[in-house]
Amino acid sequence: MKQTLFDKIWNTHVVAGEPGEAQLIYVDLHLIHEVTSPQPFDGLRSTKRQLRRPDLTFATMDHNVPTKDIFNIEDQMSRLQMDTLVKNAQEFGVPLASIGDDKQGIVHVVGPERGLTQPGKVIVCGDSHTATHGAFGAIAFGIGTSEVEHVMATQTIWQVKPKTMGIKVTGEMPKNTYAKDIIMAIIAEHGVSFGTGYAIEFYGETIEALSMAARMTLCNMSIEAGSKTGMVKPDQTTFDYIAGREFAPKKFDSAKAYWSQFYTDDETAFDEIITFDVSHLKPMVTWGTNPGMATAVDQILPEIRDDNDRAAYDYIGLEPGIPVTDIPLDYIFIGSCTNSRYEDLAIAAAMMKGQHLAPNITAWIVPGSRAIRNRAIATSIAKIFEAAGCEWREPGCSACLAMNPDKIPAGKHVASTSNRNFIGRQGAGSRTHLASPAMVAAAGIAGHFVDITEI
């Protein structure tokens, strides 16, 4: 019987349970951060349990971290959560990358960066964008607080096996279009719930040509399509990325041979298939209050189809028929677990080099990890941003979500490389427009969105 990539990994991790029912799945890697870990640790204490596998658990600080002055934590809840993580990590023997640590950063950036994320693994984290790690040919998904405690105590998790969906992506990428545009265009076409109940695998010639950073962007936003899991089969690009990293297997050739067995036997093994041709792809921009409310940069904002559209337009302060290039902008944000890797920063810097921000724009550039920040400084990418008038920040989740000081003011429009444009996501009353790093950088220079395929 033909199997998908997802099937093969799932079947090697079933501890108990029958097909068609909830099954107990072994977890190879549990990533934790300061926001969703305090209660689970308290649960271990109250039941007098130990952390079952500290060696398969890794912690970092990201959500609450101030990126302008990392050691000046004014919000008391943020300080409490971070102090609590330090104490819990010490008590239970969990490796922790704390504020100021060279290995600190956004959990979905530092996991791959350190070589923790590997093909064939089951990876969980108390964060919805854990699907990012599926870019390596792993089953990776976000879990709730009670599930975090279950994994801590048992190194397993109960899950009902989802169906599988293949998204076949073909064609040659047009100039200045990126993985962010692919996933945004797919979600705009099919909606924010078409992946519900499915594990998604991206495949096809276009996917094979993508870098690991680009694949991570694709898988990161699978949750915005309704799927908990997004995946790409491991290949030489994957192996080259992992090689030499801190936690790369010492017997690397043996690991490669093992990883190479994880692929979909035939596309007929998928329960559902969607095809997407990128040949005529244009840079995408969101206009509303969910990632499906998006259109190409050379288009006008769409007509109102229902009450959701009307409410979105009312919140965002726009009207149908306005060209995307006329959307007013006040801020740009380049960062988040979607697009804060070195490759993303290099693309954005290339758009800004030798130019200066428009006078109406405030720009925050937030690298995804300390290592990325250091590399960007060493290669003078940071200088390009600073010369353009941007604020070059410390690593953290930053303005992706309103849980730290980096909040977009009410009523202000921000071009953002993050993954969600929900109401209030980047600050109470903030108005978010998602786009690729290249698009956001170009918008910062022009003061509005521009069609970068014509640059």
Curated annotation (Swiss-Prot):
This is 3-isopropylmalate dehydratase large subunit. Catalyzes the isomerization between 2-isopropylmalate and 3-isopropylmalate, via the formation of 2-isopropylmaleate. SUPFAM superfamilies: Aconitase iron-sulfur domain. GO terms for biological process: L-leucine biosynthetic process. CDD domains: IPMI. Its cofactor is [4Fe-4S] cluster. Belongs to the aconitase/IPM isomerase family. LeuC type 1 subfamily. NCBIfam families: leuC, PRK05478.1, PRK12466.1. HAMAP family: LeuC_type1. It is an enzyme of class 4 (lyase). It comes from Leuconostoc citreum (strain KM20). Its EC number is 4.2.1.33. [4Fe-4S] cluster binds at C337, C397, C400. Pfam families: Aconitase. Binds 1 [4Fe-4S] cluster per subunit. The gene is leuC. It catalyses: (2R,3S)-3-isopropylmalate = (2S)-2-isopropylmalate. Heterodimer of LeuC and LeuD. Keywords: 4Fe-4S, Amino-acid biosynthesis, Branched-chain amino acid biosynthesis, Iron, Iron-sulfur, Leucine biosynthesis, Lyase, Metal-binding.
